[in-house]
Amino acid sequence: MTQVYDGFVHLGFSNRNGRTISHKKYQEGNSRVSADNSDANGVPYYFLINMGGGFVEGEQYQVTIDVNKDAHALVTTQTPTYVYKCEKGQLTQQNTSITLEENSYLEYMADEVIPYLKSRYFQKSRIDMDKSAHLIYSDGVTAGWSHEDLPFQYHYFRNLTQIYQDNELVYSDQTLLEPEKQDMFKLGYFEGWRNYNSLVMVSPNIDEAFVKALQKHLEGLNLESDFAISSLDISGLVLRILGKTAEDNRRIIYSCADYFRQEIHGLTPLNLRKNDMRR
């Protein structure tokens, strides 16, 4: 039986004569994809758009991205993901499936999730990639939104991200937040901050020297957020950030992405031309 989604997007990218093109662009339901854009390097990028402004209780969404051999693309969200309250206790869900072929390169730069009062949300992402492929993947979650501007008024938030290389699970990260059962301000949770973001970079070009150089680069910036970088067992790293605002955290994420783009691929910094959203 075919799964029915409230919103579905399928993007496919191929390399044609040294230039990446979009060979597939499908959208249905509440999900839309922006018109074609290209950065200063000619890399195509697209915004994922939700026509309803946010996810309603019980809705299910699917994003599928395929990047073929030698292709390079960037996909981002137009705004943060707003998850509205779930009065009936139904779970709102989004699945993301990404496939990266030989020597492909995807930058998936999702804005953070903003869970509303009483919301319940599960986000699952699976990335299948060739060992020669390059990946930048970011997401995050905030303290949420309520009419009284009280933090952590949502019921349930779960985010599971898994990366496979040659069908072997090489990275698995899960965030589970249940503010009614957990003290969100204690050590190991938000620790007094309101925004959490993570960035995963996987590339055969990432080694211990690159990780140390990136750490030094970030330490040289005037940053408002706390962050930590860890090397992965494979050629890659994970960056975790806690900050006062999403804008502060995003500055670190884009600094890392720009450093990778310049040092590894000789590309100019990102300029996605979208309004920054504070929460």
From Swiss-Prot:
Function: Required for maturation of urease via the functional incorporation of the urease nickel metallocenter.
Record keywords, A-Z: Chaperone, Cytoplasm, Nickel insertion
Subcellular location: Cytoplasm
Organism the protein comes from: Streptococcus thermophilus (strain ATCC BAA-491 / LMD-9)
Annotated Pfam families: UreD
GO MF annotation terms: nickel cation binding
Family: Belongs to the UreD family.
Predominant localisation class: cytoplasm
The protein, known as: Urease accessory protein UreD
Quaternary data: UreD, UreF and UreG form a complex that acts as a GTP-hydrolysis-dependent molecular chaperone, activating the urease apoprotein by helping to assemble the nickel containing metallocenter of UreC. The UreE protein probably delivers the nickel.
Taxonomy, superkingdom: Bacteria
